[in-house]
A protein has these predicted regions:
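N-terminal Lys/Arg-rich, disordered targeting/topogenic segments
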Residues: 1-22, 123
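Hydrophobic membrane-insertion alpha-helices, especially the h-region
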Residues: 25-42
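Aromatic-capped interface at the extracytoplasmic side
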Residues: 37-55
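Beta-strand-turn-beta hairpins that frame and shape the catalytic cleft
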Residues: 55-68, 152-153, 159-173, 199, ...
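Membrane-embedded segments
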Residues: 61, 65-158
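Catalytic metal-binding/acid-base residues of hydrolase active sites
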Residues: 74, 104, 133-134, 159-160, ...
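Binuclear metal-dependent hydrolase catalytic cores centered on His/Asp/Glu-rich metal-binding motifs
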Residues: 144-145, 149-152, 164-205, 212-213, ...
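Conserved beta-sheet core of the metallophosphoesterase superfamily
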Residues: 209-287
Length: 291
């Protein structure tokens, strides 16, 4: 005869085992989900991305000309010496690299400049303009000569002429508006190009996306900009959640835009001044292909 205590033990033991297995399953599932979430969030902050943007208004001689736009690095390092970033840019096979400001934001970050500057210059001719943070950090006078020593061409309210297959493009570079009060304006720079070179296709490197009206008024054909960080959190159907001035739902934060005159390509950027959270907005190196 089975004692009642033995019967209860035999009856309840499988139930306890099932409960333990259920708790273990829930624990493992929770750990896996959290691990995947952490990994995905890390990838959102550090996984490089690129969009190929075709601009069809350039001269025929520049068909297929490739420009990699590097913006808002903010001294962020993708691998030691930014080697991951350099390898990524190299794989894009650019004919030109445009660095459109905010490469750093603190004076003590100057030590990271040589590695990334020399690396980019070794990939393709590299041109640089300042952003607001280089001026705010008070490093422009030291930074620009250092970049030149590393093989990068600094365009300080200046322009250079590019030639390819018998056609010409003027590449203009505007200092950020945080610069000197009496510095040349975009309009004045564009007027200088037309006086000296006649009517040519113009590409402007300028940090601030929100100065798009100035670029259109100056009748620049194509502007390459950054500054907006893609709106940080890119909600579906929006141009991002937060703008550079902490405004909600900013405009012109990523991709190609038709202005009242000309076009503008805006990079979502690579880093941030503060530990900001990116969502659906991975670090960005857009590739502009002239068609």
């Amino acid at each position: 005869m089975i004692k009642e205590s033995d019967w209860n033990e035999r009856y309840h033991r499988p139930r306890r085992r099932r409960r333990r297995r259920g708790c273990l399953t829930r624990l493992v599932t929770t750990v896996l989900v959290l691990g995947l979430l952490v990994g995905w969030l890390w990838w959102q902050q550090n996984g490089l991305s690129s969009e190929t943007i075709t601009v069809s208004s350039a001269p025929d001689g520049f068909n297929g000309y490739r420009i990699a736009v590097v913006s808002d690095l903010h001294a962020k390092e993708f691998g030691e010496g930014n080697q991951v970033l350099l390898d990524y840019v190299r794989d894009l096979e650019p004919d030109l690299v445009a660095v459109v400001g905010d490469i750093l934001h603190e004076p003590d970050q100057m030590s990271m400049i040589p590695a990334v500057a020399k690396g980019l210059a070794a990939i393709a001719p590299t041109y640089y303009v300042t952003g607001n943070h280089e001026w705010a950090a008070g490093v422009v006078r030291e930074l620009e000569p250092l970049l030149e020593q590393c093989g990068v061409t600094v365009l300080s309210n200046e322009y250079v002429m590019l030639e390819r297959n018998g056609d010409r493009i003027a590449l203009l570079g505007a200092e950020d508006s945080n610069g000197y009060a009496d510095q040349k304006t975009v309009q004045e720079l564009a007027d200088q190009v037309r006086q000296e070179q006649g009517e040519v296709y113009e590409i402007l490197l300028s940090h601030r996306n929100n100065h798009y009206e100035q670029y259109a008024q100056a009748r620049v054909d194509l502007t390459l900009a950054g500054h907006a960080h893609g709106g940080l959190i890119r909600l579906p159907g929006t141009d991002g959640l937060v703008g550079p001035k902490r405004e909600l739902f900013p405009q012109y934060t990523a991709g190609l835009y038709d202005l009242s005159y000309g076009q503008m390509v805006v990079s979502r950027g690579l880093g941030n001044q503060f530990p900001c959270f990116r969502l659906l907005n991975r670090p960005d190196v857009p590739l502009v292909v002239l068609g």
